[in-house]
């Protein structure tokens, strides 16, 4: 019996040593299709940059955040803690105080980030070459100013804080310039040429892409508790809620070129 067990174990060990353990593949990088182009230089409307630098907590804020039992990521709450000051003077023995800092959106956890590269149709250029004998050329020219808006998919408390945290996570995952509102200016053009064969009509469609971000936001009541020389943050009545958002990609356009024998 022992000999048989040893034989089976040896086979298993040889199998793993021969084939090796299969590595766990890392998450695929967010890929932008070739049909999507940046128009940041060509856009006639100057969109404001939405870059969100990571807010570094002060020494006091870091101490409070590190000892909180609930993770806190809200940049507005961190900023408030940065601007706070607690005197280092020893407090009276037995001194206790509990200060209510408010009910906050504490953090956001991203579950899914996907793109709709044709979120909103913003323009169509048309070139009719049905009567032509040679190949015609056309290019993208934005005919009217178009404002693209995103937003949360449901009403939630502290919506602006939630949007800020969601956009921060989505920008980190996609490495794309995101904004809840972006504008493509009239007269925006690109030099790329599209060729229209004789007896054909060329249609160049332009779309504004957007990212669909889904996840969970955590809420809680935040208290600053002082006890003697000790200070800490206490979070009570913690709740969580699923939330989604559409966030347009700033200064980017998706192009779709089609040829047709008949008008559309």
Curated annotation (Swiss-Prot):
The keyword Signal applies. Keywords: Signal. InterPro entries: YfkD. Induction: Transcriptionally regulated by the forespore-specific sigma factor, SigG, and the general stress response regulator, SigB. Residues 1-26 form the signal peptide. This is Uncharacterized protein YfkD. It comes from Bacillus subtilis (strain 168). The gene is yfkD.
């Amino acid at each position: 019996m022992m000999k048989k067990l040893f034989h089976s174990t040896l086979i298993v060990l040889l199998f793993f040593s021969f084939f090796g353990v299969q590595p766990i593949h890392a998450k695929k990088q967010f890929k932008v299709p070739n049909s999507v182009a940046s128009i940041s230089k060509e856009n006639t409307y100057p969109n404001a940059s939405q870059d969100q630098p990571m807010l570094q907590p002060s020494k006091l804020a870091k101490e409070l955040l590190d000892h909180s039992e609930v993770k806190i990521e809200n940049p507005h709450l961190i900023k408030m803690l940065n601007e706070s000051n607690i005197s280092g003077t020893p407090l009276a023995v037995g001194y206790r105080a509990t200060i209510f800092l408010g009910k906050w959106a504490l953090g956001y956890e991203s579950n899914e980030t996907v793109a709709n590269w044709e979120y909103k149709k913003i323009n169509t250029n048309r070139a009719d070459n049905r009567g032509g004998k040679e190949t015609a050329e056309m290019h993208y020219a934005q005919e009217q100013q178009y404002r693209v808006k995103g937003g949360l998919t449901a009403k939630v408390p502290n919506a602006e804080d939630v949007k800020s945290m969601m956009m921060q996570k989505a920008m980190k995952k996609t490495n794309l310039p995101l904004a809840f509102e972006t504008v493509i200016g009239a007269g925006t053009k690109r030099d790329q040429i599209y060729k229209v064969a004789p007896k054909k009509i060329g249609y160049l469609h332009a779309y504004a892409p957007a990212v669909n971000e889904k996840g969970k936001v955590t809420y809680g009541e935040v208290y600053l508790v002082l006890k003697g020389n000790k200070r800490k943050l206490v979070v009570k009545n913690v709740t969580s809620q699923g939330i989604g958002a559409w966030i347009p990609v700033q200064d980017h356009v998706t192009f779709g070129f089609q040829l047709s024998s008949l008008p559309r």
